[in-house]
A protein has these predicted regions:
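GST-like domain detector, emphasizing the conserved glutathione-binding G-site
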Residues: 1-129, 148-150, 154
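Short, solvent-exposed turn/loop segments enriched in Gly/Ser/Thr/Pro and often Arg
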Residues: 9, 162, 211
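GST-like fold's C-terminal all-alpha helical module
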Residues: 100-197
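Long hydrophobic alpha-helical segments typical of transmembrane helices together
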Residues: 185, 189-217
Length: 217
């Protein structure tokens, strides 16, 4: 099988989730970096929605959307599993992944208007206030979820699942981009330990990895 080609954008937390998952399994990828302001024609050919991440397997096959790509990775490279072996725990982890993607990652990324898109917070101050409030509320929910396990992961066990790894881009970038939104360690000790554990994993280096520019292809 040729090396899969991952079409990515460095700042996309969903592309970052995929890069981290490949690193956890030690599976090589060819990384192609797009500029979201000048998306190459090839990207739309691979994904009619014109979004990343997209995993290009060959001239005719592409896997779209971050979770679908990670499921393909799990099916084709079962070593270092991304999901628990137990069916009940696996179903729970899949539900938690959806929550992390929809409630944590999305609110975090939309709060990063200036850092990700060069947009000033002053343009829509009410939107920024709402997004920040939502993120703070999500820390409370995350604390409750994490308190059900022995820590530091969302599912009891020694290794993280994809539900945890999906939060790696947030764990890495939040202290650098928006330190005022970092959860208070005293108020949310479980969340603090969770984010710290994600930052300490070698795979977290993939969050800042950039590929070869798509324009150079």
């Amino acid at each position: 099988m040729p090396t899969p080609r991952l079409w990515s954008w460095n700042l996309s937390p969903f592309a970052g989730k995929v890069r981290v998952a490949f690193a956890e399994k030690n599976v090589a990828i060819e990384l192609v970096e797009i500029d979201p302001r000048q998306r190459p024609k090839r990207l739309r050919e691979l994904n009619p929605t014109n979004r990343v991440p997209v995993l290009e397997l060959d001239d005719r096959t592409a896997v779209r959307e971050s979770t679908a790509i990670c499921e393909w990775l799990e099916d084709t490279h079962p070593g270092t599993p991304l999901w628990p072996a137990d069916p009940d725990a696996r179903a729970t982890a899949r539900g938690l992944l959806r929550w992390v993607d929809d409630e944590l990652t999305t609110n975090f990324f939309l709060s990063m208007r200036k850092e990700a898109f060069g947009l000033e917070d002053e343009d829509h101050p009410e939107l920024v206030t709402i997004l920040r409030s939502r993120l703070q509320q999500r820390w409370s929910t995350a604390e409750q979820l994490l308190s059900r396990t022995d820590g530091p992961w969302l599912i009891a066990g020694e290794a993280p699942t994809l539900a945890d790894l999906a939060a790696a881009p947030l764990a890495v970038r939040l202290p650098a981009w928006k330190p005022d939104l970092v959860p208070d360690a005293e108020a949310f000790p479980q969340v603090d330990a969770w984010l710290s554990a994600l930052r300490e994993r070698p795979s977290s280096a993939e969050v800042d990895r950039r590929g070869a520019p798509a324009a150079d292809r």
